Curated annotation (Swiss-Prot):
Protein name, per record: UPF0434 protein Rsph17025_2896
Family per similarity comment: Belongs to the UPF0434 family.
Source species of the chain: Cereibacter sphaeroides (strain ATCC 17025 / ATH 2.4.3)
SUPFAM superfamilies: Trm112p-like
Domain of life of the organism encoding this protein: Bacteria
GO cellular component, one term: cytosol
Signal peptide coordinates: none
InterPro entries (alphabetical): Trm112-like
């Protein structure tokens, strides 16, 4: 079984929340990027952040 690719934390410098345009934090355990201001968590799949509101989990 192969592991899925790791998220490149350097992406955090370039990515912002599509709703609030605020910064994001990385939750390694859940593999999500979290926008505390918008109260949304965006999934990371195969090392790629899915920055669609329709895919986000409400906090």
């Amino acid at each position: 079984m192969t592991e899925s690719p790791q998220f490149d934390r350097r992406m955090l410098e370039a990515l912002v929340c599509p709703v609030s345009q605020s910064g994001l934090s990385y939750d390694a355990e859940r593999q999500e990027l979290v926008s505390r201001q918008a109260r949304l968590a965006f999934p990371i799949r195969d090392g790629i952040p899915i920055m669609l509101v329709s895919e986000a989990r409400e906090l």
